[in-house]
Swiss-Prot record:
InterPro entries found in the cross-reference section: Prokineticin (IPR009523), Prokineticin_domain (IPR023569)
Gene Ontology biological process terms from the UniProt entry: endothelial cell proliferation
Subcellular compartments: Secreted
GO CC, one annotated term: extracellular region
PANTHER family: DICKKOPF-RELATED PROTEIN 3-LIKE, PROKINETICIN
Cystine residue pairs: 26-38, 32-50, 37-78, 60-86, 80-95
Gene3D superfamilies per the UniProt record, alphabetical: Lipase, subunit A (2.10.80.10)
Native source organism of the sequence: Bombina maxima (Giant fire-bellied toad)
Keywords: Disulfide bond, G-protein coupled receptor impairing toxin, Secreted, Signal, Toxin
Segment forming the signal sequence: 1-19
Tissue expression pattern: Expressed by the skin glands.
One Gene Ontology molecular-function label: toxin activity
Protein name: Prokineticin Bm8-e
Its biological purpose: Potent agonist for both PKR1/PROKR1 and PKR2/PROKR2, and inducer of a potent and long-lasting hyperalgesia. Also potentiates capsaicin-induced TRPV1 current, when tested on DRG neurons. At subnanomolar concentrations, this protein both induces potent chemotaxis of macrophages and stimulates LPS-induced production of the pro-inflammatory cytokines IL-1 and IL-12. In vivo, potently stimulates the contraction of the guinea-pig gastrointestinal (GI) smooth muscle (nanomolar concentration).
């Protein structure tokens, strides 16, 4: 029951946060549709969701660039969309 309550809270937080799009629960990129990756939850690396690839100006992880990735992603951020890179911009990395 505790796990269920945590998942419900997690989904509510993500649903009401700016720009969050969740397309489904997954384990690996191959389970997600085109233009998405299977990213770890920011709250628990044991929970993963299909999340859209990063667009221009969105935060990214510099080491997360392969799609599909055959393993389990540890980052809560997907790589940037095709044609974009993930350079450092100020204090964080952003797709550009």
């Amino acid at each position: 029951m505790k796990c269920f309550a945590q998942i419900v809270v997690l989904l509510l937080v993500i649903a009401f946060s700016h720009g969050a799009v969740i397309t489904g629960v997954c384990d690996r990129d191959a389970q997600c549709g085109s233009g998405t990756c299977c990213a770890a939850s920011a709250f628990s690396r044991n929970i993963r969701f299909c999340v859209p690839l990063g667009n221009n100006g969105e935060e990214c992880h510099p080491a997360s660039h392969k799609v599909p990735y055959n393993g389990k992603r540890l980052s809560s951020l997907c790589p940037c969309n095709t044609g974009l890179t993930c350079p450092k911009s100020g204090e964080k990395f952003q797709c550009s």
